[in-house]
Structure formats: C-alpha cells, structure tokens
C-alpha cells in the first residue's frame, strides 16, 4: 500500500510539472478551459505562414540599389545590417559594429566589428566586407544614388585588421555617422563583381545578408508576386513559432484592402487614410498606429517677386489654417500637428524656440491688413493697390495632396485670399523652376538634424533651398553644427537656427505622418509598439503564433468555501 501511494504522489508531481511547463511555454499566457475535473490549456504550435500585403514590389534586394523603391527599402532593412543603426530616439546605435571612436580633429573614425557578427550562410563579417561595400559606391560607374557616390568618393577607407575599419574624412562631418547605417554586402560572395555589374547580378533576387530575416531558398518572387522570408536563427536564438513570413505584392490599394477583407493576408504594413475606414470595419482586424518619421509642410517662396515674400503674409496664411481639421477630415485623424523642421523624436527638436500657430482668423486678418492687403467694400479678394492677393499653390498630382490643397484653398478663402492649385508629376523640377508661391509636399528627414542641404546659403545654388531663404546666421549655425561630433556642442547651434527659422517662417509644418499596421486576430500574442523602422513591427515576433493545440491537464484545486 505504501509503495502504491508513493507512485500516486510521484505521478501527481509529474502531472503538476507537466501542467506548469505547458502553461509557461515560450512565455505565453495559457488559456484554460474547464469541463468537470478535466481542463485544457491552449499552447502555441509551430507552423503556418504569416502573410503581409504591400502595394508595389521590390526591384532589387540590395542595400546599395533600393533607395528609390519604398518596398525594396523596407525588405532590405529586414535582410541587411549596417555598421550602425538608427534607434527609436533618432540617435545612432551599434549594429554590426559594437563601438566606434572619433579622433580629436574630428576627421578619423574607427569602427570595431562584433565578434559574433556573421552572414546568413555562417561566414564571419569582416572589415573586408565593409571595404568592398563602400568601395563599390566609390566607383565611377556605380549605378545607385549619385549622392552616395559623391559622399563615399570623399572618404578614405582602410582595414586596420579583420575587425577594425577606419574612415578618414576630408573635414569633420557629424552626419557621416548616419551613412554607416547602410547595409553591408558579403565580400566572400561578390568579390569579383564590379559596380557596373550590380544591377543585373542574381544576388539582387536571392541575397545573403546579416539581418533578422533571410530569403527562403527555391523561389522566384519576380514571377510569383510574393517573397518568402525565414527567421535568421542566429538572431532569433530561441526560435519562432511561425517559420515563414510571406510578402505579397499588390498593384494598388483597392486590391490590397480586398485581400485583407477576404482573409487572403494576415497583415498590411501601411494602412493609408483612404484604406482606414474599410480596415477599421473588419471585426477580425486589429489596428496599431504610431508616429512615422515623415511630415508634410508648406514651403514659401521668399523671392522678391513672390506674393508671400512679406513675413506678415506668411504668418497670416499660417494663422488662417486649421491644421487639425485637415488631419481629422482628410486623413481620418492619421497625423500629428507640430511646429518646425525637426520631428518631435529628434534630439534637436525644441518647441520653446517655435511659435505655435493655432487657428486664429482674427490675427490672420490683422496681419494681412498690416501688410497692406485690405478688403474693399464689395470685394471678395484682398488687394494691395491694384494687385489681388492671389496664391499659386503647387502640389503633387495625386492624393492626398490634391484634397489637402483644396481644403487649404477653402480655409484661405475664408480670410479673402485667392488660391490657384497647380498640380505636377515632377515636384523637384517644379520647385527648382520657382514658379510657385507656396508648395505642399512631404519631407522624410534624416535621423541626424543636419539641414544644411535644405536651408544654407550654399543650398541656394547647389542644394534644395527652394524657398530661397537667404539667412547668413542660419547658414553659419548649420555649418558649425555639422562640424562637431558632440550632441551637447551641436545643440546651441540648432537652437539658434530654430530661432532664426521661426522669425522668418520660410516653411510651415502641417503634420507628422503616422503609420497604421493592420493585423489579423488570427495572429496570437502579437504586441506592436513603436513603428519607426520596418523591423519595429516584428520586435516581439518570437512570441507570435498562428497555430495552437489544446492540451488536457488536471484542473487546479478549488479552494473550500
């Protein structure tokens, strides 16, 4: 009898341990079901395919060639790592490099690679990979962005040893650090490839990188219209319940949202304002929204012959706008109103230096009157002498820009300002022509707060200072800031720049974009947080699961009443 009792105790203990192990499987919270004395718990099971839909398709899965293709850029960011990466706070953080140093003269940087950095095929990442990658961009026939070639041709690169890379700059240039976020290419695979051969190389369709995802073998995504990725188990060391992510490429938003509604896909990475009502109406879809590193602005033409060359007119146009109404009515609330040329996530953002342009038609009217633009009896448009206050508003010939331009036109009409909308398919060319008073477009700022190429005096001739803002002190502040490496030393220069920017108002920020991610309820244990980069939405992917099994266990004892 005693022996029999001992076996009963042992079996009970083993049963309890089994139950506890099931309950704690991969850190998931178990779901208990009760039936008499028998309970079941739902635990993750490995398997299934996570399908994500996107509009468009990549052309090259290559970090040196993907800049012009939004889908390609996102996929490349999942497959490749740079020496560094941009953190959620906009600051540069280690990636393949574990650390770096800057010389006292600010011209020499040395990066030390991580000892455990390896390619998807298991080969170690070495300084030779860095030299090869940056060397391709230095070649005259490099087929990627011309700006990359210009930058890297001015840099001397040397491998100090297998794990140390040295860069020597022509002069101190703090924004250079962000250039090291670009993904590296494997020298051991591409050593004999020249820059001219990059565009047609098979590597672009089936690359080997270092990122958290790798391209699955035996597929032709250019023909099938979908790309399968598998987890890089050197990153996901504990494994993942979902073994495959499949990106499906759709020609337009209509076909993408239809696929989501029909259950053909389990996620959509970018729900636009136009897609939001349909997505929100699906009971089995969850929506996650976060701020995105992009904003929309109004750029003023400050040349003498522009009708907005007077500060009071620009301020009046700003006060006449209800930016929150634009976001709420045209973007379904998918925007965040803020001030200035820096995103709130940037360390250079300082709202204390900026005027908050709250909607104020009375102030707008007073500023216009003070500038000489008055409204005569019986007239609907203000005039200064015989000249009517007529704004030429330039924007892209697509949505949501056309609808935004029309709404802005209506709001300015309320203070008796006439507006003509000019739509273009080539914004850069139209801006360079100067044939506009105000331009409406998007800005995707770099993580580094350097705005020299947009607002300096040099950018009037060899940059993108399309507003023609010619301010010597602002230009000097930007130039000084980019030559310093310490954030503490740079900050006062950016504060000065912001004060000058605010006092001149060469541009008015309308809103920061948001990124809305749609996810099926069939994806369990998914927790989506910050969405600064494409990787962010998969931060907790190790916990996600599509399949599960119900396992019977003994019910927990019920306390006596």
Task: Give the positions of each predicted feature.
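Surface-exposed binding/hinge segments that line
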Residues: 21, 25, 112, 147-193
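Aromatic- and charge-enriched surface segment that lines or borders ligand/interaction sites
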Residues: 98-143, 160, 166, 259, ...
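N-terminal lobe/hinge region of extracytoplasmic solute-binding protein
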Residues: 53-104, 135, 208-210
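Ligand-site clamp/hinge motif
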Residues: 201, 232-278, 409, 416-420
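Alpha-helical secondary-structure segments
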Residues: 51, 126-133, 162-168, 212, ...
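Detector for C-terminal structural segments
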Residues: 12-26, 296, 320-355, 362, ...
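A structural "hinge/loop" feature
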Residues: 54-76, 96-97, 123, 146, ...
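Gly/Pro-rich hinge or "lid" segments in bacterial periplasmic/extracellular proteins
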Residues: 181-240, 244, 254, 361-366, ...
């Amino acid at each position: 009898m005693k022996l029999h009792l001992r076996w009963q105790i042992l079996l009970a203990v083993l049963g309890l341990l089994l139950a506890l192990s099931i309950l704690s499987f991969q850190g998931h919270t178990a779901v208990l079901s009760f039936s008499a004395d028998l309970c079941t718990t739902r635990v993750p099971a490995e398997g299934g395919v996570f399908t994500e839909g996107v509009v468009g398709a990549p052309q090259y899965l290559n970090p040196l060639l993907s800049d012009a293709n939004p889908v390609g850029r996102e996929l490349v960011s999942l497959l490749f790592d740079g020496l560094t990466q941009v953190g959620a706070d906009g600051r540069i953080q280690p990636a393949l490099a574990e650390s770096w140093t800057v010389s006292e003269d600010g011209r020499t940087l040395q990066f030390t690679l991580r000892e455990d950095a390896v390619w998807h095929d298991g080969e170690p990442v070495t300084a030779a990979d860095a030299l090869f990658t940056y060397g391709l961009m230095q070649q005259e026939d490099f087929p990627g962005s011309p700006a990359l070639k210009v930058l890297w041709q001015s840099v001397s690169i040397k491998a100090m040893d297998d794990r140390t890379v040295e860069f020597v700059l022509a002069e101190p240039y703090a924004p250079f650090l962000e250039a090291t976020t670009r993904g590296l290419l494997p020298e051991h695979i591409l050593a004999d490839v020249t820059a001219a051969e990059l565009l047609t190389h098979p590597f672009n369709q089936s690359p080997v990188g270092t990122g958290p995802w790798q391209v699955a073998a035996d597929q032709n995504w250019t023909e099938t219209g979908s790309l399968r990725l598998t987890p890089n188990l050197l990153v996901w060391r504990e494994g993942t319940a979902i073994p495959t992510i499949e990106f499906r490429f759709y020609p337009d938003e209509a076909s993408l949202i239809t696929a989501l509604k029909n259950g053909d896909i389990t996620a959509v990475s970018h729900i636009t304002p136009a897609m939001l009502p349909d997505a929100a109406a699906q009971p089995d879809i969850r929506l996650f929204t976060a701020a995105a590193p992009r904003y929309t602005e109004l750029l003023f033409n400050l040349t003498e012959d522009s009708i907005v060359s007077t500060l009071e007119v620009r301020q009046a146009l700003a006060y006449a706008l209800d930016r929150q109404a634009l976001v709420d009515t045209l973007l379904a609330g998918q925007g965040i109103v803020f001030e200035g040329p820096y995103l709130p996530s940037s360390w250079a953002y300082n709202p204390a230096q900026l005027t908050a342009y709250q909607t104020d038609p009375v102030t707008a009217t007073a500023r216009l009157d003070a500038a000489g633009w008055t409204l005569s009896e019986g007239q609907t448009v203000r005039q200064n002498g015989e000249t009517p206050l007529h704004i030429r508003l330039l924007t892209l010939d697509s949505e949501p820009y056309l609808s935004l331009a029309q709404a802005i036109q209506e709001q300015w009409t309320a203070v008796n300002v006439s507006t003509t909308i000019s739509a273009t398919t080539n914004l850069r060319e139209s801006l360079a022509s100067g044939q506009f008073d105000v331009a409406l477009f998007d800005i995707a700022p770099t993580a580094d707060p350097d705005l020299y190429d947009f607002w300096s005096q040099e950018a009037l001739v060899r940059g993108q200072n399309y507003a023609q803002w010619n301010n010597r002190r602002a230009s000097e502040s930007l130039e000084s800031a980019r030559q310093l490496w310490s954030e503490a030393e740079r900050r006062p220069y950016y504060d000065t720049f912001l004060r000058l920017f605010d006092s001149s108002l060469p541009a008015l920020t309308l809103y920061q974009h948001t990124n809305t991610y749609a996810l099926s309820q069939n994806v369990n244990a998914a927790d989506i947080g910050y969405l600064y980069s494409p990787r962010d939405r998969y931060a907790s992917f190790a916990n996600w699961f599509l399949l599960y099994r119900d396992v019977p266990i003994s019910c927990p004892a019920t306390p006596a009443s």
